[in-house]
Amino acid sequence: MIRSHVDVVGSLLRPAELLAAQKKFAAGELQPADFKKIEDRAVDQAVTLQEEAGLEIVTDGEMRRQSFQAQMTAAVDGFGEHTLDAFLWGQWHGDQATGDWSLARPVALGVVGKLRRRRHLSAEEFTYLRARTRCIAKITLPSPSLWVNFWSRQHSSHAYPTLESFLADVTEILCEEVAELARLGATYIQMDAPHYALLIDPATQGFYEQQAAQGGHSASVQQWLDRALELDNAVISAAPAVTIGLHLCRGSQASRWLAEVSYEPIAPTVFRKNSRLTGFCLTTMMCARDHSNHCGRFPTISWWYLA
């Protein structure tokens, strides 16, 4: 018997009140306590929406984040000044209604100092969410190797001479975060890895090869993938009792997508080397490229979610 499994994988749309408040807060026109109340209301609305839809697992809609991975840069010193473009750059593909859209990688993007955590990334998100629902509260965290984007030989080498040394500190912070969430009672964490599809897309894989070369070593796509999965497994091992789901997608922003490839080339490695995972969340709706049966690559996995 197949049991259906439904939960929210990405961010929910921010309500107009929150969008307006974010602008006012950034401009210094709104006090932190007042801004927090508006964020809280947005989370409450997101929880109600999911509960009324009958979901057994709910998120806070990532209402408190600039982007799905931005809780890292918000809680950790060393990333330097950056805008939302740091998370959105790339060649985005669209359909006839949305069209393509391009954004160059910011030239100043790059970690500028040793990473130092000022506070936990998602502990506050989790404790607030847990207090607002009787459902399972899910928190999302980024895969460590997603942060390859934030290393630059020009801007980062004085703090992190190699890309590997930077990723080691990122991984340590995420391990500490998973352990703290488990201590607080979290039972389900989603690890977001949209960059895995970019590793095999001919239009984007060159960036990762270039980052490796500038970071002190050469790396093929397979070597990149193997190392990325090692870092994932390190984070997962920080809380063995917590359910971890790996989310793969091709990027999703304003009904556009970044990668246009099948998961097939990476399926054997991803599905078999992430042996500590409980499940996978595979987003397939943005670009219909997947006709093969990926689930057959790893028949012992507890559950799959196909969006």
For each predicted feature, which ranges?
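Domain-level signal for soluble alpha/beta catalytic cores
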Residues: 1-307
